[in-house]
Structure formats: C-alpha cells, structure tokens
Amino acid sequence: MAVPKRRMSRSNTRSRRSQWKAAAPTLITCPNRACGQKTLPHIACPSCGTYKGRQVTAAV
C-alpha cells in the first residue's frame, strides 16, 4: 500500500478538496396532473401519494 513520503501542505490539501462538490438532487414533476409537485424520481409523491399512476399512500 502506498504511503506518502512527505506531509501534504494545507494549501495543497485544500486546493485538492476544493473540487469535491455535492451533487444537486434530481427532481421531477409529479406525473399526476392534479398535483404537479417536484419530487424525487422512483419515490411516491409525498403530497398526493401516487406512484406510477396509482395511489400507494394516503394523500397529505
């Protein structure tokens, strides 16, 4: 296993870590025409409770 020979400076460490970015969550509009809320894909809509065109949970 590789082991660093020298300690990495604070500026080099921070410049390397500056490229780490959190990805924004992908949002879709609810396919239920009456709802139209933004929701995560492959998850039942939290506002109307539908998933793939059928009611799976109680509406809030």
From Swiss-Prot:
Record keyword Ribosomal protein present: yes
Pfam families the UniProt entry points to: Ribosomal_L32p (PF01783)
SUPFAM superfamilies found in the cross-reference section: Zn-binding ribosomal proteins
Xref: InterPro entries: Ribosomal_bL32, Ribosomal_bL32_bact, Ribosomal_zn-bd
GO biological-process terms attached to the record: translation
Compositional bias per record (Basic residues), positions renumbered to this chain: 1-19
Record's keyword annotation contains Ribosomal protein: yes
GO cellular component annotations of the record: large ribosomal subunit
Keywords: Ribonucleoprotein, Ribosomal protein
A molecular function (GO) term: structural constituent of ribosome
Coiled coil residues, start to end: none
Region (Disordered) residue spans: 1-21
Family of this protein: Belongs to the bacterial ribosomal protein bL32 family.
The protein's name in its UniProt record: Large ribosomal subunit protein bL32A
Native source organism of the sequence: Nocardia farcinica (strain IFM 10152)
Lineage: Bacteria, Bacillati, Actinomycetota, Actinomycetes, Mycobacteriales
